[in-house]
Amino acid sequence: MTNILSPEKSENDQELPIRPSYLQEFVGQQQIKENLSVFIKAAKSRNEHLDHTLFYGPPGLGKTTLAKIISNEIGGNFKSTSGPAILKVADLAAILTNLEKNDVLFIDEIHRLNTAVEEVLYPAMEDFELDIIIGEGSAARSVKITLPKFTLIGATTRLGLLSNPLRDRFGIPMRLNFYNTGELKKVLNRASKLLDIDLTDSGSEEIAKRSRGTPRIALRLLRRIRDFAAVDGKSRVDKEISDFGLNRLEVDRIGLDSNDYRYLKFIADNYNGGPVGIETIAAALSEQRDALEETIEPYLIQIGLLQRTPRGRVITIAAFEHLKMPVPNQSHHQFNIFNENE
């Protein structure tokens, strides 16, 4: 699922020039910043590596950025890979044996590591040892390699898919939450200075309100609104051009786009608001279940338009009101289903 409001990273996002390098530059996630600052200072004062850290939460909130910041703060090299990229034990062994003391190894989508790779990762995380089998059959032998003290940082949008043994080996688990409008305005104002964009306060407010609580989306929208302003002959990004551009991009006043409307209207039109199973929704919309669960549903739940119940997805009265559709009589009963099974 690719669209202007997708929180997934795009090759066109070009975040490097505006990506913060240190904790004091990072906007939002205040509790996480404060705790990380304490943990990093304590580790450095003891001349120890930082405990392995797990960032989880919706995409686009800064998990990769925070991992790079940690690397900068502790003075180690930053090595990055992803769960799907580590196909074999040999792939992991090659990465681990090239690490140096205090290096940060970042594994994105860590929930997608296969079981064989995970089992080799356990002693590497706990004892900083790599146990691998050399050879085959009767000639096979176990080789133990001592690894330097490194910090593994995992990132996932699907904490529930992470195995318990792997999750338990992270000493610092941290959940990243959606940003509020004020925090997103700070993100936009910082970026506008670095990108030399004349962004007014009202323009920043308009973009922030329609960015789904996600910095990555806010920055992407800022670039596109800048394009509309330039072609329209405007030297600054104000509320008027922001509203015009966002409407052209089909982003409504609360940050919903055509994909969100398709999702909500399918449940409203065909199931009177639900409940309906996620597989049914995915098949009807010709989307992958993962794409719906990671890209569309988190924000709809966050703003109170959708509920996940034991019997399926249910859209709320607020969703019907936003769609300007009459609320079916049974809707009140549907919401009681959620409460009874919670």
From Swiss-Prot:
The keyword Transcription regulation does not apply. SMART domains: AAA. It catalyses: ATP + H2O = ADP + phosphate + H(+). CDD domains: AAA. Residues 1-179 are annotated as: Large ATPase domain (RuvB-L). Gene3D superfamilies: 1.10.8.60, P-loop containing nucleotide triphosphate hydrolases (3.40.50.300), Winged helix-like DNA-binding domain superfamily/Winged helix DNA-binding domain (1.10.10.10). Its EC number is 3.6.4.-. One of its GO terms (molecular function) is four-way junction DNA binding. It is found in: Cytoplasm. Has 3 domains, the large (RuvB-L) and small ATPase (RuvB-S) domains and the C-terminal head (RuvB-H) domain. The head domain binds DNA, while the ATPase domains jointly bind ATP, ADP or are empty depending on the state of the subunit in the translocation cycle. During a single DNA translocation step the structure of each domain remains the same, but their relative positions change. The RuvA-RuvB-RuvC complex processes Holliday junction (HJ) DNA during genetic recombination and DNA repair, while the RuvA-RuvB complex plays an important role in the rescue of blocked DNA replication forks via replication fork reversal (RFR). RuvA specifically binds to HJ cruciform DNA, conferring on it an open structure. The RuvB hexamer acts as an ATP-dependent pump, pulling dsDNA into and through the RuvAB complex. RuvB forms 2 homohexamers on either side of HJ DNA bound by 1 or 2 RuvA tetramers; 4 subunits per hexamer contact DNA at a time. Belongs to the RuvB family. This is Holliday junction branch migration complex subunit RuvB. It comes from Rickettsia conorii (strain ATCC VR-613 / Malish 7). The lineage of its organism: Bacteria, Pseudomonadati, Pseudomonadota, Alphaproteobacteria, Rickettsiales.
